[in-house]
Regions:
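Helix-to-beta-strand junctions that scaffold the AdoMet/dcAdoMet cofactor pocket
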Residues: 65, 129-131, 145-147
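Conserved SAM/SAH-binding loop
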Residues: 54
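Core SAM-dependent methyltransferase catalytic element
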Residues: 176, 189-211
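Conserved beta-strand signature within the Rossmann-like core of class I S-adenosyl-L-methionine
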Residues: 148-155
Length: 211
């Protein structure tokens, strides 16, 4: 029985990794399309992806907006076997290497001045930053967004980690941010909360708006 359970667990983990894989036609490609579809963006200027992993969303952004320069930052820990070299290889394979830059970075303290980017995006990153205040991470990402710039920050926003996100969205509105919304990406991107939960992303929500 234990052997069967371990085999099932291995198959499940393998399936999840395939969904996250670059260019694998998995669920994450659909998630990326949903995230980018909520950006009211003219395609000019610079995009920052916080936590770029394999570079998939960075590259998708470059393909979607041919005039944009896209910067992907990541801590690249050992858990997922991603690296700067892998991101650069993936960007080259899609023909966008000249417009994609990848560099080491920390979501808790981004190495960019205030108001550096026209767009800031992120996808399932913040909940992996151990011991961090999730709302502070969001504010740090928004710090580097230009006035008038747009953002789309997607994560598994469990209340025990994120706290009151409706209250946070209102806080942003009170600070002058416009068109701030929380979108249920478990439903929109995965088709159902059950399917999202199979990937341990049942509380997926996308925070979007304009600074």
């Amino acid at each position: 029985v234990i052997t069967i359970a371990l085999l099932v667990l291995l198959i499940w983990i393998t399936w999840i990794r395939r969904q996250y894989a670059f260019g694998g036609g998995g669920i994450m490609e659909q998630v990326h399309r949903v995230v980018l579809s909520h950006l009211d963006y003219d395609g000019e200027g610079k995009i920052l992806e916080v936590g770029c992993g394999s570079g998939a969303l960075t590259i998708r952004s470059a393909l979607t907006w041919p005039k944009a320069k896209v910067i992907g930052v990541d801590y690249w820990g050992a858990v997922y076997n991603y690296s700067k070299a892998l991101c650069e290889k993936n960007a080259a394979s899609e023909g966008v290497a000249s417009r994609c830059v990848f560099q080491h970075g920390d979501a808790k303290q981004l190495d960019f001045p205030d108001e550096s980017f026209d767009v800031v995006i992120s996808n399932y990153v913040y909940h992996n930053v151990m011991g961090a205040d999730m709302q502070k991470l969001l504010l740090e990402s928004l710090r580097v967004l230009k006035k008038g710039g747009v953002f789309a920050l997607n994560d598994d926003m469990k209340p025990k980690m994120y706290g009151d996100m409706e209250g946070f969205a209102q806080k942003l509105r009170d600070m002058g941010y416009q068109d701030v919304r929380l979108i249920d990406t478990a439903q929109e991107a995965f088709g159902s909360h059950r399917r999202a939960a199979m990937m341990m992303l049942g509380s997926s929500r996308l925070l979007v708006g304009r600074k």
